[in-house]
Amino acid sequence: MPSALWIAHVTVTDEAAYSKYAAIATEAIAEHGGVFLARGGRYVQKEGRDHPRNVVARFPSLDAANACYESARYQEALSHARGASERDLVIVEEYE
């Protein structure tokens, strides 16, 4: 079964609230087998809308990544991100 990538592009508008999101989300992602590959590092924007924070996490499968997003723990995290950020998130299955 191929692994999956969780790719988020984020503009933070409230650092205090977003830091609560990040702490809880980090735990939820780990609980579902996710590991961070990139998290807020340097980047070059080539196309589309610029977001200054970019995050990539790898999960064991598309199902695991989706289960993480739908989990109560991650939804708790999202309650802190709403109103504290503008976000785009896509989950993509990796090519085998």
Place the predicted regions along the sequence by residue:
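C-terminal structural segments of small proteins and small subunits
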Residues: 62-90
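Short S/T/G/P-rich N-terminal loop/turn motif that feeds into the first structured element of a domain
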Residues: 1-53, 59-70, 93-96
